[in-house]
UniProtKB/Swiss-Prot annotation:
PROSITE patterns: PROKAR_LIPOPROTEIN. InterPro entries: CusB-like_dom_1 (IPR043602), CusB_D23 (IPR032317), MFP_Efflux (IPR051160), RND_pump_MFP (IPR006143). It is a lipid-anchor. SUPFAM superfamilies: HlyD-like secretion proteins. This is Solvent efflux pump periplasmic linker SrpA. The periplasmic linker protein component of an organic solvent efflux pump. Involved in export of a number of low log POW compounds including hexane (log POW 3.5), toluene (log POW 2.5) and dimethylphthalate (log POW 2.3). The solvent resistance phenotype has been postulated to depend on the operon expression level. It comes from Pseudomonas putida. Residues 98-127 form a coiled coil.
Length: 382
């Protein structure tokens, strides 16, 4: 027997359906009313940028002189304090001079005798009492005696061992009473001139050639009178206060490393720099007139390592765009293409965006580019 449904039940079904449809509509309205995510953006700008290269290096003394005896004898006295500053020509040691003083007196006597004989023969030659050959022999003997006298006098002077340069003297390797000899292998002490001081750094030849090409093509401009200026950072991270000057580059390339050595000279009045210290030298390369820097936090890389940024377009929608990075400059990347001046790139809220969605873009607070991004007046003029 077929069951007949109540008209009341039939009226309930459409009502329930209407309620369900109404609920779905409310959810769609709520979903469509969700505001776009907030993101922080950095507006790209192009400015002149002074490019620099940070190269590791070591300090080396401006002059180094080993003190050695030039005559043999017993060391009588040491006349300096180890580790002190000495001047050019300052006496450092005294070698027993008695033997050399006696040789000087003998040489002086021989010189006087030869001189008197030569003058006597000169008078006798006028009267033909001696031959011309005898006179010439006497004159040559006089000159020989004069040379022997000068050698003996120099040997006496060499008993006073003097500093060959001005600088700081190290420890003495001998004491009073020691026998020293002319030409001995061991030096008596070493004097090192510390002001100024050299800094030797190495640069790959490929980078040096690339820099030369960039300057020749006009992509980089010279920085002007300060092109050869070098600044220094010590091993503990502190900056050396006095600038240096690039003096020369080596004329050959090291075949084992493919690098060329550059030498800079720094004033060192307080002797803060000592030979053998590890340092970083900052060399100016040139000025790029329309450099574009992108904050590091704006760049992401895919599985292939290709860098990209999120760009906010004029309609506030976003798109991912690949860029080409050249080098780091402080906390930013210098790029060659991918974005242009005036475009906005996302630096905050990157995790909330995907391609094509609309965003609410505000100026980012986490962007703090390096001070070097703003060009100096001098760099702009060049």
């Amino acid at each position: 027997m077929r069951q007949i449904r109540s008209p009341r039940a039939l009226r309930v079904i459409p009502l329930t359906a209407l309620m369900l449809i109404s609920g779905c509509g409310e959810k769609e309205q709520v979903s469509s009313a969700t505001p776009p995510p907030d993101v922080g953006v950095y507006t790209v700008r192009a400015q002149a940028l002074t490019l620099t290269t940070d190269l590791p290096g070591r300090t080396s003394a401006f002059r180094v002189a080993e003190v050695r005896p030039q005559v043999s004898g017993i060391l009588q006295k040491r006349s300096f304090v180890e580790g002190a500053e000495v001047k050019l020509g300052q006496q450092l040691y005294q070698i027993d001079p008695r033997t050399y003083e006696a040789q000087l007196r003998r040489a002086e006597a021989n010189r006087t005798s030869a001189q008197n004989l030569a003058r006597r023969y000169e008078t006798l030659l006028k009267t033909k009492a001696v031959s011309k050959q005898q006179y010439d022999d006497a004159l040559a003997a006089w000159k020989q005696a004069e040379a022997d006298y000068q050698v003996a006098r120099i040997d006496v002077q060499y008993t006073r061992v003097l500093s060959p340069i001005s600088g700081r003297i190290g420890r003495s390797t001998v004491t009073e009473g020691a026998l020293v000899t002319n030409g001995q292998a061991q030096s008596l002490a070493t004097v090192t001139q510390l002001d100024p001081i050299y800094v030797d750094v190495t640069q790959p030849i490929t980078k040096l050639l690339g820099l030369q090409k960039a300057l020749e093509s006009g992509r980089l401009q010279k920085t002007g009178e300060n092109q050869a200026e070098v600044s220094l950072t010590l091993d503990d991270g502190s900056a050396y206060p006095l600038p240096g000057t690039l003096k020369f580059s080596e004329v050959s390339v090291d075949p084992t490393t493919g690098s060329v050595t550059l030498r800079a000279e720094f004033p060192n009045p307080n002797r803060k720099l000592l030979p053998g210290m590890f340092v970083h030298a900052l060399l100016k390369e040139g000025v790029q007139n329309a450099a574009i820097l992108v904050p590091q936090q704006a760049i992401s890389r895919d599985t292939r390592g290709v860098p990209s940024v999120w760009v906010v377009k004029a309609d506030n929608t976003v798109e991912s765009r690949e860029i080409q990075t050249l080098r780091t400059v402080g906390n930013a990347w210098l790029i060659s293409n991918g974005v242009t001046e005036g475009e906005r790139i996302i630096t905050e809220g990157v995790q909330r965006v995907r391609s094509g969605i609309a965003v609410n873009a505000v100026e980012a607070k986490n962007v703090n580019l390096v001070d070097g991004f703003a060009a100096t007046t001098e760099a702009s003029a060049n």
